[in-house]
């Protein structure tokens, strides 16, 4: 149990039977009344963000989480098989627990967050930016750069990304895994 005043970004708490990560907090001391903590909490399972206010003396159940690097090996049915890079144990992780799964390639290293007491995987985070080779895209027309037009491109993981017209097949691009957006072209 922790006091509400001890909540910081990244703190994991159990509330109403659900796990939440604190993504934003503010210690508020109004001119009149009691001091409180205004927080934004993200549901680990659904990703839903809610705002919650806690009185300073309020006790909360904290959950100890572990973050470890895992390497993606292969897909088996609906599960993805990952290897713990410290113990070399292999663990299946469900598709819906992996953020940015469309950009997952064999050998990629992800950060797996698990409940330390139960060893239950809460979610797996891809790196924020990944570099991938464009495997297919329509050729851009020469001189067609007057507008900021985007075209679909398929990358080596099979995902489709909207890219500028000047990107061609075989080029390596950088992608933001949070929203699947094009970040830039990688210089060779």
Curated annotation (Swiss-Prot):
Pfam families: EFP, EFP_N, Elong-fact-P_C. InterPro entries: Elong-fact-P_C, NA-bd_OB-fold, Rib_uL2_dom2, Transl_elong_fac_P/YeiP, Transl_elong_KOW-like, Transl_elong_P/YeiP_cen, Transl_elong_P/YeiP_CS, Transl_elongation_fac_P. It comes from the Bacteria. It is found in: Cytoplasm. GO terms for biological process: peptide biosynthetic process. GO terms for molecular function: translation elongation factor activity. SMART domains: EFP, Elong-fact-P_C. The keyword Plastid does not apply. PROSITE patterns: EFP (PS01275). Pathway: Protein biosynthesis; polypeptide chain elongation. Its main location: cytoplasm. Keywords: Cytoplasm, Elongation factor, Protein biosynthesis. GO terms for cellular component: cytoplasm. Belongs to the elongation factor P family. Involved in peptide bond synthesis. Stimulates efficient translation and peptide-bond synthesis on native or reconstituted 70S ribosomes in vitro. Probably functions indirectly by altering the affinity of the ribosome for aminoacyl-tRNA, thus increasing their reactivity as acceptors for peptidyl transferase. This is Elongation factor P. The gene is efp.
